[in-house]
Amino acid sequence: MKIRMKQTVSMLLLTGFGLAAATEAFSAESLQDVMKRRNLSQQDLLAASKTYVPTGKRDEFMAFSSGGQSGQIIVYGIPSMRILKYLAVFTPEPWQGYGFDEESKAVLRQGNIDGKEINWGDTHHPAISETDGKYDGQFLFINDKANPRLAVIDLRDFETKQIVVNPIFKSEHGGAFVT
């Protein structure tokens, strides 16, 4: 038992020293060294710096991208292109609890058509709410291309609040437009 413990401690110490040496070698590298090692130009560095957002800082803009047949919306930051959130809309999402509590089940049931439960969608063409023709960022609307429905997402908490069925159409390939 003691021999095994000594071997384990020795291995951990050697690993620690190896990591420390490697970290020191990379941290001593200058910007010019990195540019040379990776064959980067000044233009490459400028392009990278235009999209870089340090940890803890916020992106200047957010984009709302339709998730297509996932029935979701993907929110990502610009310029970093980091995925900020997946918004559950027409499809239950077990990993975030959407469609598994009474509140979100009730929202999904609003999208039932002729009493038939439809727990899937094809999200396309999001639109942001406007006041006097200017974006106000209060709500996001998104079309379900496979079924005649539209969803309303509250941008204060990024949750789907309402699914509105269009009783006239059977399906639509339209989009959400705010007027």
Question: Which residues make up each language-model segment?
Answer:
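Sequence/structural signature of beta-propeller modules
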Residues: 12, 24-75, 79, 85-101
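Bacterial N-terminal signal peptides
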Residues: 10-20
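Structural hallmark of WD40 beta-propellers
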Residues: 60-63, 137-141
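Long, well-ordered hydrophobic secondary-structure segments characteristic of membrane-embedded
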Residues: 131-132, 140-144
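Bacterial N-terminal signal peptides that target proteins for export
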Residues: 2-12
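Structural signature of eukaryotic scaffold interfaces centered on beta-propeller domains
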Residues: 36-58, 98-136, 175-179
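Beta-propeller domains
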Residues: 66-110, 142-167
